[in-house]
């Protein structure tokens, strides 16, 4: 079983990493190619391309200038400890044991506009480049064209090493990021957990809650060493419960109703 997550825009490079071990990203050469293109942009170009404020654009202009193809703890931090958004509040990697992080290293992957596909302990230099950014490059009009089937092939390599267990990809990523994966080329079926909250007289996806819940699901899989999709139906953290009637073989729906 492989779990894929989206990255986070918010990053934490202030809190010291609680584990010393780290690995190097697989697609450094590809990331370097993107950085070369990003370095040609002015801060105003970046602000327009990414629809961000001028201060954020200047910050990322400097990040691209500082980025190096050589990774070390001096200029980078393990991805799962550097990302700091809603998903990663749910996953809460800083409280995982060394054994849990080792398991996550084998089973969790983070999709990234710049780095393609990251393992939890892959070193990450600070950046901003969302997968949906229409950044024209030598391979096409956007990042989906840039990555092509590279991410899918990398996932297949990892799925194909899973002998004796169910080969399945659990999609805990956003739609924007999962578009970088080509399900028809995957060597495994996809199961997508969907989290809905009761609001305004019906169940709906509330972004903040859904992101956090996807992180909780990834942590649940890691801590419980889940290997079969059926076991995902037992997930019941923070009052979510599996709804069989709303689910099917590829979409597992979890709902909660707190108050009225």
Curated annotation (Swiss-Prot):
Coiled-coil residues: none
Pfam families attached to this UniProt entry: H2O2_YaaD
InterPro entries: YaaA
Protein name: UPF0246 protein Bamb_2261
NCBIfam families: PRK02101.1-1 (NF002541), PRK02101.1-3 (NF002542)
GO BP field: response to hydroperoxide
Organism field: Burkholderia ambifaria (strain ATCC BAA-244 / DSM 16087 / CCUG 44356 / LMG 19182 / AMMD) (Burkholderia cepacia (strain AMMD))
HAMAP family on file: UPF0246
Family: Belongs to the UPF0246 family.
Cellular compartments per GO CC: cytosol
């Amino acid at each position: 079983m492989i779990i894929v997550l989206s990255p986070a825009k918010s990053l934490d490079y202030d809190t010291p990493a609680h584990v010393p071990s780290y690995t190097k990203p697989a697609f450094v050469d590809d990331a370097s190619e993107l950085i070369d293109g990003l370095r040609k942009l002015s801060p105003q170009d970046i602000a327009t391309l990414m629809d961000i404020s001028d201060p954020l654009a200047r910050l990322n202009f400097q990040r691209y200038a500082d980025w190096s193809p050589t990774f070390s703890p001096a200029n980078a931090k393990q991805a799962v400890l550097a990302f700091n958004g809603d998903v990663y509040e749910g996953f809460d990697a800083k409280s995982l044991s060394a054994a849990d992080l080792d398991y996550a290293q084998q089973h969790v992957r983070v999709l990234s506009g710049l780095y393609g596909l990251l393992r939890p302990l892959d070193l990450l230099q600070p950046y901003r480049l969302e997968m949906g950014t229409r950044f024209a490059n030598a391979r096409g009009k956007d990042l989906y064209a840039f990555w092509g089937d590279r991410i899918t092939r990398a996932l297949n390599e990892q799925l194909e090493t899973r002998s004796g267990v169910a080969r399945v990809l659990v999609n805990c990523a956003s739609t924007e990021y999962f578009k970088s994966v080509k399900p028809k080329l995957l060597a495994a079926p996809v199961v997508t957990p969907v989290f809905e909250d009761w609001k305004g007289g019906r169940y709906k996806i509330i972004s903040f809650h859904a992101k956090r819940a996807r992180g909780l699901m990834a942590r649940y899989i890691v801590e419980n060493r889940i290997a079969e999709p059926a076991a995902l139906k037992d997930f019941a953290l923070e009052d979510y419960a599996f709804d069989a009637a709303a689910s099917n073989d590829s979409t597992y729906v979890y709902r909660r109703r707190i108050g009225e």
